[in-house]
Amino acid sequence: RDVYKRQIINIIEIKRDKTMEEKIILPQNTRLMGALLGFIGGGLDVFCHMHYRSLVATQTGNLLLLIADWHDPRVENTIMRFSSILFFSIGFLVALHIKEYRKTAFWRTKMLIPLFVVTLLIPLVSVIPPVEVPFIAFGTGMMMLTFTGSLIETHPYVIFMTSGNYRKMLTALYRITRGKGDLDEYRRQAMNYGIVVGSFVAGAISVAILMHFIHPVSYTHL
């Protein structure tokens, strides 16, 4: 009996240790990080659409714009959308190569440098949209690969295209209203995906408001 009891105790302790390990949230998987990445994702595409009439993160959106505006007399818009798709793809593939041959644990930080440098330099140079868009798209492609498979706590999400996050939030809310299953887990899912979706929308609105006031002023000083 003593041996049997010890075995049961060991099994319980092992399960408890595994549960504790599962509850450990890495720094990149916190709600704060999810909110920041969602904010950046929403703000980046709104800025590029308002400033360049092109998207850099939602490339399916660029394809739709190309088809919908095929009669657009401004060839510059078409060129920027094509270049955005091309350089986003190149940036994503370059980042994929770097990830496969990484030799340091800080590879994610290095792959954020291109987008960081571009966003610092753009306000300092003259307005040349056909040149600026490819660089932003390249850095965004690298960032997309860097955060592929991102988690907010234990739930996977996408930092740029938030339709999937919104769908998961609605699914969790529906299950909560049904009152069946693990309600605590569903509430946590709804909260986490709600944070990502809310921060994405907040980033988009914030940039749109800033562009309304800053954009005309910036042009008067060029």
Feature names for model-found ranges:
Residues 1-7, 220-221:
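Conserved small/polar residues in nucleotide/adenosyl-binding loops
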Residues 8-13:
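Short, positively charged and aromatic/hydrophobic N-terminal segments
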Residues 16-17, 21-222:
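Alpha-helical transmembrane segments of multi-pass membrane proteins
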